[in-house]
């Protein structure tokens, strides 16, 4: 074979490999974002809530009233957008993010979609979710290359369900409408809320200030994954800068962290950029 012929064969081979890579990337990206849209539809099509609960402790009813939830609420989903910073491990540099989230009101379900610029021109897409009996955390570079994929299992479900419970401060109508939540009054400023059955059972505490706003959340045993190892760790969050939006009293600032050997590690800090509530039946 001549030198020219060898060059042609190599060029064709490289072109073929490039074409295969492009097709693979397109298929992977379409699969990933198609999955996101499927999860989104599932949360948005959550069932229409039944009448507000009448079996709640008076302290929970008082909190709902404080947050602006009317007795005749028929809220179905909450939609919000966020911006902020995340830290992957103690001492790491902060990663800026923007996110949008849909949270179901009458059942434990949500989808969080975030975009983090790892470096110039290299975004990471992250989804965190509970939908039906499925829960997961996934991240993809460019929406093509999977970096993290943790899904299903009772431990995963517990962790994500605990996030739903912690975010009741952004989902106040769920206090009256979500019959999957079990409440206990621990003292005048502490409410415990739980959900799930069997090995999926989980509980957090909502800490109120003197005015009755939720300013802190706590859990003793939220699953934390490091590599392939999962351990239960103390978990906490703080909230503040309450404002009234669409009749609901919502904290615009929040941060979340782990308590590691009695030292706080804040891994998420964010701000609510927009918030809205959708009510009534699915159209």
Q: Each predicted region: which residue ranges?
A:
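Short, Lys/Arg-rich N-terminal segment immediately upstream of the first membrane anchor
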Residues: 1-7
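Hydrophobic alpha-helical topogenic segments used for membrane insertion/localization
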Residues: 7-24
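N-terminal leader/targeting segments and the immediate start of mature chains
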Residues: 32-79
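N-terminal mature ectodomain segment of secretory-pathway/periplasmic proteins
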Residues: 62-65, 69-145
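Short, hydrophobic/aromatic-rich segments at coil-to-beta transitions
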Residues: 74-81, 105-113, 135, 185-194, ...
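Short, exposed beta-strand/loop patches in secreted or surface proteins that constitute
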Residues: 100-105, 127-129, 179-186, 206, ...
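Flexible, processing/modification-adjacent segments and terminal tails
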Residues: 138-197, 230
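Gly/Pro-enriched, hydrophobic low-complexity segments
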Residues: 192-279
């Amino acid at each position: 074979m001549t030198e020219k012929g060898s060059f042609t064969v190599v060029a064709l081979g490289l072109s073929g490999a490039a074409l295969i890579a492009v097709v693979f990337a397109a298929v992977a990206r379409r699969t990933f974002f198609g999955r996101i849209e499927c999860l989104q539809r599932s949360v948005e099509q959550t069932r229409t809530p039944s009448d507000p609960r009448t079996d709640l402790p008076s302290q929970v009813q008082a909190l709902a009233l404080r947050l602006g939830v009317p007795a005749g609420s028929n809220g179905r989903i909450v939609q919000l957008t966020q911006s902020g910073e995340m830290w992957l491990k103690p001492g790491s540099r902060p990663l800026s993010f923007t996110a949008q989230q849909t949270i179901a009101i009458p059942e434990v379900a949500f989808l969080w979609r975030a975009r983090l610029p790892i470096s110039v021109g290299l975004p990471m897409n992250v989804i965190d979710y509970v939908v039906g009996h499925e829960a997961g955390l996934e991240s993809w570079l460019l929406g093509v290359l999977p970096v993290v994929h943790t899904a299903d299992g009772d431990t995963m479900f517990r962790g994500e369900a605990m996030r739903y419970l912690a975010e009741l401060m952004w989902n106040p109508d769920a206090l009256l409408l979500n019959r999957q939540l079990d409440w206990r009054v621990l003292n005048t400023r502490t409410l415990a809320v739980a959900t799930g059955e069997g090995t999926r059972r989980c509980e957090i505490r909502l800490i109120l200030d003197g005015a009755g706003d939720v300013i802190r959340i706590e859990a003793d045993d939220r699953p934390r994954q490091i590599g392939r190892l999962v351990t239960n760790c103390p978990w906490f969050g703080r909230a503040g800068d309450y404002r009234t939006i669409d009749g609901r009293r919502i904290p615009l600032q929040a941060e979340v962290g782990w308590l590691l050997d009695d030292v706080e590690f804040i891994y998420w800090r964010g701000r609510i950029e927009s918030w809205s509530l959708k009510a009534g039946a699915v159209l």
